[in-house]
Amino acid sequence: MASGDLYEVERIVDKRKNKKGKWEYLIRWKGYGSTEDTWEPEHHLLHCEEFIDEFNGLHMSKDKRIKSGKQSSTSKLLRDSRGPSVEKLSHRPSDPGKSKGTSHKRKRINPPLAKPKKGYSGKPSSGGDRATKTVSYRTTPSGLQIMPLKKSQNGMENGDAGSEKDERHFGNGSHQPGLDLNDHVGEQDMGECDVNHATLAENGLGSALTNGGLNLHSPVKRKLEAEKDYVFDKRLRYSVRQNESNCRFRDIVVRKEEGFTHILLSSQTSDNNALTPEIMKEVRRALCNAATDDSKLLLLSAVGSVFCSGLDYSYLIGRLSSDRRKESTRIAEAIRDFVKAFIQFKKPIVVAINGPALGLGASILPLCDIVWASEKAWFQTPYATIRLTPAGCSSYTFPQILGVALANEMLFCGRKLTAQEACSRGLVSQVFWPTTFSQEVMLRVKEMASCSAVVLEESKCLVRSFLKSVLEDVNEKECLMLKQLWSSSKGLDSLFSYLQDKIYEV
């Protein structure tokens, strides 16, 4: 049985911008040292906004302290250089007591040097920012100084255990027996020194990471409460990075739920969940693990607004340009093994299509057993348009399901099908409204998971057994044709010219 450990985020160590100008954060995983830190793109931290806000807030506070310190030093030097002239300007007697009072009065009218109260009460002001953190103050000869955040006994900053609140974010299949996730999470106690929070980001079907709470009066908090069940991955308050057979997946997320395995396409190395041989290998490995564990079925979905954009064209150009014969064989075999894994998987496969599915991402859908789609989803297989032959057994399954006329229009002309059209033609089982899509899917998946594993597996065998050998033969022929196409200079030049034109258009 494959293990299903969840890796919890301890804190954010650093951030940077990648080559595309997007933010990446250096994550410290709880229970791991600094050598295990990994850079994660911002779209993988969909529900870890409070970690991001805390990190950004501390940096903003640090910058403010530096600026305040510089201004304090400058103002002090100016006062020292003026000397008695300060007292003369005040038009007050020059006795020591009055002089001291005058100095403090000038200090109050200087905005950067607002006088703090000793023993600050910690209550937020009525006109302050809505989300705040606990910070202590003291007055030093050089001016205002901010004391470090207090550490609680569990090592977290102002940490309070928020088990009741966290439990609301778990689905029924998320809390495994013997695995108390709440032992590793602490709610942040927000609310004394005003520190602005950055706007929280939202991104389709994705993984959920967070550790902390927001002020109840914050509009961000109200938005999270309203949308906490909108997306599969916004139910958990943890990282969904999972250990399967002692290895971590880089471009997919695998979550072991109660009665089923959930695989999410979440590519770090390609845009719009495009497929490369490495990503397809990870999916195959996850399918192999799910086939041998106690899961009754498999749920396949994706992170982001696009389900899958098919093969990664930029990857094809780079690899086929370097070594045409070797790479054409390797990529064609990767596609063959990827499709074969779906054909041979014995348990029911449920697919949740949250957005566009193109090319190979749409071709594999007939190999799955149930396809549920959002109203926003659409389907396209423009193989002839991009100078490729069909893949994913679509040359056989599409005419069988859609009819020869519509299948030819999709494969030869790249016709786009809406979710409703795909449902009426039999490619999609059912279409749901986007705002309730995740709830509808999870409800039905959990109902299926309550059935007998033997009944589900044997039922699929009865439906699919006579097609298995046919699909395997079709898969072999399609991949052989792709290999021949990529190996020939004519076919490769045609592909390059089209893909380069598309890249230049972007």
Swiss-Prot record:
All copies of domain Chromo, residue ranges: 7-67
Gene: CDYL2
Keywords: Nucleus
High-level lineage: Eukaryota, Metazoa, Chordata, Craniata, Vertebrata
Subcellular location: Nucleus
GO cellular component: nucleus
Location (main, coarse): nucleus
Pfam family, one: ECH_1
Annotated protein name in UniProt: Chromodomain Y-like protein 2
Species the sequence originates in: Homo sapiens
Region (Disordered): 64-177
Record's keyword annotation contains Nucleus: yes
